[in-house]
Amino acid sequence: MGRLYQLISGQVFDRIKSVTSSHVVAEVGAVYHFKITNDKCYVVDLKNGEGSVSTGEPLEKPEVTITMNSENLLKMFNRELQPANAFMTGKLTVKGDLSKALTLEKIMKAAREAGK
């Protein structure tokens, strides 16, 4: 089951990539580093150019680093787990600018809608 979540976490980031644009970059202005504990690290750059999503470590210091497992990422993406609850129960950790972290919900919503 873990491998399935790893594959699906890649699809979540593919969806996020599909909604990146210069408009989103102008609105958000942040680099996010996702450390998926049982998978890869992902960088969501919503600060530079048209925006980008890649695997690995960020080239610049991220405004926000989020650590969670792939199962909780999928649950959050599908709205089965609320970010505040995940944070309060230790299912995810956030380091950096909390206000920038909160803007991710808009990005996740746009990515969910793009997949419909």
Feature map (PLM): residue ranges:
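Feature captures hydrophobic
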Residues: 1-116
